[in-house]
Amino acid sequence: MKKKLIFKSPLYLFMLFGLFFLNSCEKDNAPLEQPVYSDQVNFQVAYDQAFENSVYPSLILGLSNYSARNGESFELFKYSMVNPAEHTEVKVNLSPSLINNESAFHAHLDTVDKERAFFPMINWNYENLKSLKQPGTVDLSFACYINGEETDDKSLRLNYRSVNECVYGFIDNDGNYIDFGWMFAAYVNENNPSIDNFLQEVLYHHVVDAFIGYQGSKEEVMNQVFAIWNTLQLRNVKYSSITATSNPSQKVLSQYVRSFDEVYQNSQANCVDGSVFLASVLMKIDIKPFLVLIPGHMYLGFYTSEDKTDFELLETTMVGSINLNEIYEANGQVYNLNKYLGYVSLDTYNRYLNGYATLENLKMEISYNSFLKAINQNISSWNYNRSAFNNPDNVEYQIFDISELRKVVQPIGI
């Protein structure tokens, strides 16, 4: 089917969130004539109240590339102080912890007795953030230096969440809802090393001989996606509705999202898990996917043409609607085939009975027809909700084009 797809860019959300760094450089220290005391400086450290003293690794990891390219980052921390004298050099040092490397902030202050606030760049420990599978607590230590002399120190205790916890929205300090639904794209991880093993498994079943992306016809694109679908069914991947987290926050909305390896190894997925898993594989073989978000549900879309003029939809939860492994032959009989006769043509069934088709031929047809059913599952819903998708103010209906979002959102690397 030929359709025109419009997706809403998340870039305007960054302006709402205020992703700015303050770039600063060190200057020569000019010593004060009088000693400086901590009560003069009134050094304070605060963490963004909207996140209720919790650090979300997925948010930091997903936007790390945007920060690196643009010299901007979250205003999660705020340093405030009063300048005790003219022309002072300020340094705030954050000691290393489980979630960050040593981070130094520098500023040059001119006006005496003026209170200043800064939003520093934090040197996060990205590898540690990727490894945080369970919530926990971390203590951060800050030291404030005026012209090279330490004048004060502060400690801040924060909670950290699991890297699997995807923040898809929060209430800011002014009571406004900030949509972060596009963060689901961070769980699409085309760089996961396990994808190569999975693709070898797909090729082993000989549905396709190679992955060629858009180098062939639309039919060849569809066959590549079906080959992936068929392998998931042979692995007996089942639907699992687990989405809840232990997060007690009333301001931050989040959902547990399984990593690629968790789906691959445990053969369980909900609508989000299955969609980001398949999107990860499609990105790897150069077929461009998108995620479709509707109230309480997510499904997958993929372009069947490189110019994005054609696309198909796929209901990923239906991958577990059949169990190919329970169809087998023994003692001259075939077991459990009757459950799936609705997926088999009469011609193929008769050919099987007459010995002209194998049980594997039957299973392949069952799998393919389940794939076509999943392709058609959401067409009516898509057409009905088209106006909602095109409404930038309706955050419950969104389309997340992964290749477009890669400009700002990177895989979190799990």
Q: What residue ranges belong to the model's regions?
A:
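Intrinsically disordered, low-complexity regulatory regions in eukaryotic proteins
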Residues: 218, 243-268, 290, 372-373, ...
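Bacterial N-terminal signal peptides that target proteins for export
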Residues: 2-12
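Secondary-structure boundary elements
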Residues: 180-266, 308
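C-terminal motif of bacterial Sec signal peptides marking the signal peptidase cleavage site
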Residues: 20-24
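Hydrophobic/aromatic-rich core segments of domains that either
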Residues: 269-378, 383
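Charged, amphipathic alpha-helical linkers/stalks
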Residues: 170-183, 335
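Bacterial signal peptide processing site
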Residues: 26-28
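Beta-strand-enriched, solvent-exposed domains that form extended recognition/catalytic surfaces
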Residues: 30-169
